UniProtKB/Swiss-Prot annotation:
It comes from the Eukaryota. It comes from Encephalitozoon cuniculi (strain GB-M1). This is UPF0328 protein ECU05_0050. Pfam families: DUF2463. Belongs to the UPF0328 family.
Amino acid sequence: MNTTHVPEPHRTEQHAENQRHWRKILGIAPIVSIAFPATMYFISDEDSFEDSLFLRFITVLLPFSYSAVQYALLHTNWKSHNKPERILQSILYYTLNLLFLAFSIISILSIIAFTLAEWEDDDWENNNDPIIFSFILPSFTVPLTYLLSTSCCLVPGQIGFTDTGINVLVDILILLCSAGDLVPAFDEVKHCYYFAIISSILILIRLLREKLSPEKQSPPPTAPWRIAVFVLILISIVIAYALLAYLIMNADIFDNYYSSLFDKMKNIFSSKPDE
């Protein structure tokens, strides 16, 4: 009996090739996710974001889609490849499982909430929602997601920061830029694009080093400082997504819509028929 059989090495090579293509796409995604919203801000008029629902949607789509996909992948991989055997492992397993799922959901809700919310463009120096959604939030959340996805090992017993050499310095600078990105939000928002530019350049440098330099075996991330860096990255992400959740809950998405609808209904019922 003749049967068609695909050799296992061929399947393995095809799977590895697909993974390489997927890594290339995800590799440039953080840069595009930061640069595209910034570009939309510069090429649009001052009142365009307030008037156009579609413009708001495409501005927030890429950064939060990137985060949603990355955390969904982390959640799937962590859930399928790790089985807790001890109490501490169970706590870590369910904590990270819940966090990755929450981060992915918050990213999706951010797309919806920030698209439907009205973006006020009051003052370049003070409250400027287009700058917040185009610069501050993408350059705050995307680099942190990138660091967790590429620079950390999520294997039980080996959880920690894995980068070596100059990449350690680059990653620390990326982390500092993400933290510094919040400063303009409380001071002068016009300075925030500096952090977006620097973050994109640092990520580009890291990607070029990965492409040009031969891959080296990462050391086991069991050193205390590597675990500390991983914890710092994770805490920063928790703070970032707690802030996003707060912004979503205070976005007042439908307030203006329902207020306008209520006023129209009130006028209809309060109006008297012509005599």
